């Protein structure tokens, strides 16, 4: 365990605005919580410069064969797993590109294993099990900024020369001093004292959304604001794929359906084929040459 006293942590402080939350009507109780939640986006906004640095590093790592690995315990670990699990269906990437590791393993997603967070060695073992290397990025998540499991991972990653990021909600935390890039939205005391699944968890989720989304945009997974590498694995996504191609090209549904069928529902390739009027083989050749960036591929043929 670290030596930082809990009573010195912002996330463990008592919130003066909600001291009587147990004595008010339901609507007033919810207003109290909502008023606290309003502070989250502003706290994240103050960290945008640091988030941008992290996004650039992650995007660079992706282009050079690296991965983004989240580590955390409890709520923080679950948020990392959640963000990572959404990347493959949304952006068509492998399940290995963005991974979430939670202290205590997969079972900790559904049942708290709080003691697992106290071991530095456990995180090092978990990272070695996935062959974490110097080309990867490690993002350690902990509201307190003092979780031994995460600190162990950050120290290990630093030791092998990997880029490290900390996502905390306490200023000047131990994690922020260890990581190469510190992201620390200070959301203040929770509505329920110490319940960091609330404001702190919301802030962390917003930051993780930015990290993964920003990196995917930087690596050509988005055209305009359309997710052009999604995998059409169910009926909803099949329809979304059609809409995306229609929106990107202004084409009629009939033409879009024909092209998507020809490309086996490769949304990006379908868009470029329509925009370039090239056949599938030539369009794919130019897209691959431009590393999947539609904008760059269009520039080449203009």
From Swiss-Prot:
Protein name per the record: N-acetylmuramic acid 6-phosphate etherase
Start and end residues of each SIS domain: 58-221
| Gene that this polypeptide is encoded by | murQ
Give the PROSITE patterns listed for this entry: GCKR, SIS
Query: Pathway listed for it?
Result: Amino-sugar metabolism; N-acetylmuramate degradation
Name one matching Pfam family: GKRP_SIS_N
Q: What does this protein do?
A: Specifically catalyzes the cleavage of the D-lactyl ether substituent of MurNAc 6-phosphate, producing GlcNAc 6-phosphate and D-lactate.
Q: Does the keyword Lyase apply?
A: yes
Can you tell me which residues form the catalytic site?
Answer: 86 (proton donor), 117
Quaternary arrangement and interactors, per the entry?
A: Homodimer.
Name its GO BP terms in alphabetical order.
amino sugar catabolic process; N-acetylmuramic acid catabolic process; peptidoglycan turnover
Q: Which InterPro entries match?
A: Etherase_MurQ (IPR005488), Glucokinase_regulatory_CS (IPR005486), MURQ/GCKR (IPR040190), SIS_dom (IPR001347), SIS_dom_sf (IPR046348)
Report if keyword Lyase is assigned.
yes
Q: Which reaction does it catalyse?
A: N-acetyl-D-muramate 6-phosphate + H2O = N-acetyl-D-glucosamine 6-phosphate + (R)-lactate
GO molecular function term, any single one: carbon-oxygen lyase activity
Keywords (alphabetical) are:
Carbohydrate metabolism, Lyase
EC annotation?
A: 4.2.1.126
């Amino acid at each position: 365990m670290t030596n930082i006293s809990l009573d010195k942590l912002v996330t463990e402080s008592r919130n003066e605005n909600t001291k009587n939350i147990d004595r008010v009507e339901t609507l007033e109780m919810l207003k109290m919580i909502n008023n606290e939640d309003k502070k989250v986006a502003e706290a994240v906004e103050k960290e945008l410069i640091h988030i941008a640095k992290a996004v650039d590093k992650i995007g660079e790592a992706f282009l050079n064969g690296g991965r983004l690995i989240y580590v955390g315990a409890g709520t923080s670990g679950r948020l990392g797993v959640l963000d990572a699990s959404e990347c493959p269906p949304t952006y068509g990437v492998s399940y290995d590109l963005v991974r979430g590791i939670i202290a205590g393993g997969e079972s900790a997603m559904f049942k708290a294993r709080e003691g697992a967070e106290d071991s530095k060695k456990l995180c090092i073992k978990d990272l070695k099990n996935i062959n974490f290397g110097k080309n990867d990025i490690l993002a350690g998540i902990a509201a307190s900024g003092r979780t031994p499991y995460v600190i162990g991972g950050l120290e290990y990653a630093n030791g092998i020369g990997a880029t490290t990021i900390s996502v905390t909600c306490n200023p000047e935390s131990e994690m922020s001093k260890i990581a190469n890039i510190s992201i620390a939205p200070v959301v203040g005391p929770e509505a329920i004292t110490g319940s960091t699944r609330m404001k702190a968890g919301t802030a962390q989720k917003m930051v993780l959304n930015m990290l993964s989304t920003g990196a995917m945009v930087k690596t050509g997974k988005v055209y305009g604001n359309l997710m052009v590498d999604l995998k059409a694995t169910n009926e909803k996504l099949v329809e979304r794929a059609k809409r995306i191609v229609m929106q990107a090209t202004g084409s009629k549904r009939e033409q879009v359906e024909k092209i998507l069928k020809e490309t086996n529902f490769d949304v990006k390739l379908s868009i470029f084929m329509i925009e370039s009027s090239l056949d599938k083989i030539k369009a794919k050749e130019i897209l691959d040459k431009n590393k999947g960036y539609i904008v760059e591929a269009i520039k080449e043929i203009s």
